[in-house]
């Protein structure tokens, strides 16, 4: 996703000895352009990724998703699916922190044949969203770049936010620009060099 691409672009630039760089990365969802810019912090850069196009997502296997899931999603006001190379369910709530992700996340995801990332989202300020994430195959995660992007896109189409949206997640903040191209911008920090042994 977008967060992984930001980190990958940072790692490639660092390996090449470049503080600022631009690379194109081939992904299953298409070619993604990544631009890395320096910051005042030595090990942190700002990386921007072109995220592609948000399309309608998959349909659940039930007619009324919220009624079928029941109590774990009682706080959901409305929801919509989206796809940006991977499937997402965006759920509007008043307080994302009040949602029991360990219950609500898999309860919603289970109604999508190939699974889906599930996001509980609230407007937290002018052109700002707060998001908590249940990620398919991973569970509760602190951040999701593709999720931040689709949440901003869905809430923009609902008329709740503008074209540039700051998305707050437990793992940090990202800026989504819904222009052309649609971009995700956020920090990427070098933490460690790892040597992976051959199996």
Feature roles, as predicted:
Residues 3-143, 150-199:
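Active-site proximal loop and beta-alpha junction motif in alpha/beta enzyme cores
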């Amino acid at each position: 996703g977008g967060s992984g691409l930001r980190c990958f672009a940072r790692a490639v630039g660092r390996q090449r000895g470049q503080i600022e760089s631009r690379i194109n990365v081939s992904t299953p969802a298409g070619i993604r352009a990544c631009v890395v810019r320096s910051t005042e912090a030595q090990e942190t850069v700002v990386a921007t990724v072109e995220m592609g196009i948000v399309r309608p997502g998959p349909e659940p296997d039930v007619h009324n998703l919220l009624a079928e899931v029941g109590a774990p999603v009682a706080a959901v006001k409305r929801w919509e699916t989206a796809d940006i190379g991977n499937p997402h369910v965006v759920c509007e709530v008043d307080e994302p922190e009040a949602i029991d992700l360990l219950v609500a996340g898999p309860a919603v995801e289970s109604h999508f044949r190939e699974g889906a990332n599930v996001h509980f989202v609230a407007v937290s300020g002018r052109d700002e969203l707060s998001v908590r994430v249940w990620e398919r195959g991973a569970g509760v995660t602190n951040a999701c770049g593709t999720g931040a992007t689709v949440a901003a896109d869905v809430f923009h189409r609902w008329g709740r936010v503008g074209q540039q949206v700051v998305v707050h997640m437990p793992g940090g903040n990202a800026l989504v620009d819904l222009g052309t191209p649609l971009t995700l911008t956020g920090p990427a920090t070098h933490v460690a060099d790892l040597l992976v042994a051959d199996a």
